[in-house]
């Protein structure tokens, strides 16, 4: 646990994996660069997690790879280590490109790559919307070995010829299920069209719906697969409950009642729309509860500041849309409340994955109106899980 990965589930994970994949029990067995190994150990890793021990060697061999594993299993480091192994830092050109669905995730990936590559003199830039284009241009013109970004800004920088693609050898799609939803699909194709024909493609995600797997055939050649069977994906250590609220109007009072009974370390409350986030934030503040909020239409600086406050524990309760749900590491979060059930059932695992990350116990509570019962049952079926009615002693579950 010292290295931030929950390994207790590793032995029980079912890997629906290509036959040619072997397991590398140590990082030394992967034959990584000495400078990279130093960075890995300095970062706090001692031995590879289940997904790392299977996927890194395949990616470093140049194979197109689909890697699927739950939150908290070290997915980000899987491709970060692989990228750092294959790039040549002597060549000051972009050699690997990582696309993520949110700005926060792209920035976090950049910081992981910089930390793991601390002894390699690696240049990695976060190329994201909502930031100063001039800064992007300056950094890209200087030369970046790795670019971690969101599809829109990356496509724009390629079109403007500031992000040069001729040396790119690897494209990573992180949280591919979200990226390949309709909103990002065209932008990914825009980026892909500019890449050299032999570019290696790596797809990483906690959930890979069948239509996404089908779509990857369009830009992957004979990919190696490291897949956890879908029914294994509900996160261990997360207790999942629902509260029947009958009507939408009753949710607010239910939330206030919960605040009175729960002593919370940190909690995230998810709503489905920006408008609902703003409305609930105002209503909670009127009732003298201290909350912060975040959604995708806030200026980037404001989002960064809110994230930093929450990471440092200065704010304890964050109300957010799904912009926050994917891959953001805040280890103190012990409670997630789905004020609204997610409209996309695949987002459910990303939301509740916020609580109990890295083996910490967590509780997820779903507010369910009469109209939501069908959606809740659909989520239970999809993940082969059971979501029980919340018991009276819920405060004990968090202690």
UniProtKB/Swiss-Prot annotation:
<dbReference type="GO" id="GO:0006364">
    <property type="term" value="P:rRNA processing"/>
</dbReference>
<feature type="short sequence motif" description="Q motif">
    <location>
        <begin position="25"/>
        <end position="53"/>
    </location>
</feature>
<comment type="similarity">
    <text>Belongs to the DEAD box helicase family. DDX48/FAL1 subfamily.</text>
</comment>
<keyword id="KW-0378">Hydrolase</keyword>
<keyword id="KW-0694">RNA-binding</keyword>
<keyword id="KW-0347">Helicase</keyword>
<keyword id="KW-0547">Nucleotide-binding</keyword>
<dbReference type="GO" id="GO:0016887">
    <property type="term" value="F:ATP hydrolysis activity"/>
</dbReference>
<dbReference type="GO" id="GO:0005524">
    <property type="term" value="F:ATP binding"/>
</dbReference>
<dbReference type="InterPro" id="IPR014001">
    <property type="entry name" value="Helicase_ATP-bd"/>
</dbReference>
<feature type="domain" description="Helicase ATP-binding">
    <location>
        <begin position="56"/>
        <end position="226"/>
    </location>
</feature>
<dbReference type="Pfam" id="PF00271">
    <property type="entry name" value="Helicase_C"/>
</dbReference>
<dbReference type="InterPro" id="IPR027417">
    <property type="entry name" value="P-loop_NTPase"/>
</dbReference>
<dbReference type="InterPro" id="IPR011545">
    <property type="entry name" value="DEAD/DEAH_box_helicase_dom"/>
</dbReference>
<keyword id="KW-0698">rRNA processing</keyword>
<feature type="domain" description="Helicase C-terminal">
    <location>
        <begin position="237"/>
        <end position="398"/>
    </location>
</feature>
<feature type="binding site">
    <location>
        <begin position="69"/>
        <end position="76"/>
    </location>
    <ligand>
        <name>ATP</name>
    </ligand>
</feature>
<dbReference type="GO" id="GO:0030874">
    <property type="term" value="C:nucleolar chromatin"/>
</dbReference>
<keyword id="KW-0690">Ribosome biogenesis</keyword>
<keyword id="KW-0067">ATP-binding</keyword>
<feature type="short sequence motif" description="DEAD box">
    <location>
        <begin position="174"/>
        <end position="177"/>
    </location>
</feature>
<dbReference type="InterPro" id="IPR014014">
    <property type="entry name" value="RNA_helicase_DEAD_Q_motif"/>
</dbReference>
<dbReference type="InterPro" id="IPR000629">
    <property type="entry name" value="RNA-helicase_DEAD-box_CS"/>
</dbReference>
<comment type="function">
    <text>ATP-dependent RNA helicase involved in 40S ribosomal subunit biogenesis. Required for the processing and cleavage of 35S pre-rRNA at sites A0, A1, and A2, leading to mature 18S rRNA.</text>
</comment>
<dbReference type="GO" id="GO:0003723">
    <property type="term" value="F:RNA binding"/>
</dbReference>
<dbReference type="Pfam" id="PF00270">
    <property type="entry name" value="DEAD"/>
</dbReference>
<protein>
    <recommendedName>
        <fullName>ATP-dependent RNA helicase fal1</fullName>
        <ecNumber>3.6.4.13</ecNumber>
    </recommendedName>
</protein>
<dbReference type="InterPro" id="IPR001650">
    <property type="entry name" value="Helicase_C-like"/>
</dbReference>
<dbReference type="GO" id="GO:0003724">
    <property type="term" value="F:RNA helicase activity"/>
</dbReference>
<keyword id="KW-0539">Nucleus</keyword>
